[in-house]
Amino acid sequence: MLKIGFGYDVHPFAENRRLILGGVVINHPKGYGLLGHSDGDVFFHALIDSLLGMCGLGSIGEYFPESKEFENISSSILLEKTIDLINKRYIVKINNIDVVIISKSVNISSITGQIKNNTSCILNLEVSRINLKGKSGNGLGVGGNDQGIEVYCTILGEIDEI
């Protein structure tokens, strides 16, 4: 069955935190990172929600609550755990992933390839099926007002129950 998944996440900037997008550590112009219970990788969090949504399995918080077990955990591990969870119930073939990253101060153009490669490796998916685009937000919203980063993710895939 052809299904679509949609994910969204937002994290505020914070001092004394790392800034990670799609497993890539970035230097923010003001030295900020992203606040979060895990490593705060807002890209992987939106991707996880999109995958779960495509499979009708709820949201990231249902599987990875704010507990000691997941405190400061790498979001790439959370993504791997999500794939394992999905693969126990479904055979999934992802057609494509499309992602919008909104931030006034973080330009993703130099790291798009790295994010796509990281995502491709974890999902075992061709890089050509992953599209990323950065937007400034034009002074609107959390990303546009430079309070944090917002990510929207859409996935189209074929899903069959095991």
From Swiss-Prot:
Coiled coil: none annotated. Keywords: Isoprene biosynthesis, Lyase, Metal-binding. GO terms for biological process: isopentenyl diphosphate biosynthetic process, methylerythritol 4-phosphate pathway; terpenoid biosynthetic process. A divalent metal cation binds at residues 9, 11, 45. The keyword Lyase applies. Its cofactor is a divalent metal cation. 4-CDP-2-C-methyl-D-erythritol 2-phosphate binds at residues 9-11, 37-38. It catalyses: 4-CDP-2-C-methyl-D-erythritol 2-phosphate = 2-C-methyl-D-erythritol 2,4-cyclic diphosphate + CMP. One of its GO terms (molecular function) is metal ion binding. The record marks 37, 136 as: Transition state stabilizer. The keyword Cytoplasm does not apply. This is 2-C-methyl-D-erythritol 2,4-cyclodiphosphate synthase.
